[in-house]
Amino acid sequence: MAKVKHNPDAAALIDKGISELEPFAQVICKRLRKIILSADPELIEDWKWGPNYYLNGMVCGYWGFKKHVSFVFFQGSLLKDKKKILLENPLNVHNRHIKFTDVKQIDDKVILEYLFEAIDNNRKGLKIIETKDKTIITPDDVVKAFKKAKVLAYFDSLAFSHRKEYVQWIESAKKEETR
């Protein structure tokens, strides 16, 4: 296996990060971490933007939020999802995730099945083939606001990923006045 550059402080960063989460999320993250690390001895625990597990590419990661923990499979759209538990974001063709709000929702055997499949896919080098269509539909009200503020040209000059993230962020607003 090729030498992979990873954060040598990953374990300590993960410990610290988990300790700062809400108590319910700490329990869930610790359980997921234990399951993930038991899945394959070659799986590398890493820290990117949070806990990340690597074997011939990123396999999975997790993180706690105010009311849930999101467990992400980075090439999740390749998984068969026999239990129909994976959620998707229509703006992300790769990832699939599971939301947990209570540790009792975690079925170790099911998580391991999904992990084994994801690890096997990475070992085989399977990848999502993205279409070349990099179109973002920017809501009309956002375009109007950008024109009024004279920043539309700047927005259009941003990289696709930045524009996509910005539109997702705006569309995720729970109230119209915060849009």
Regions found by a protein language model. Name each.
Residues M1-R179:
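Charge-dense, helix-prone N-terminal extensions
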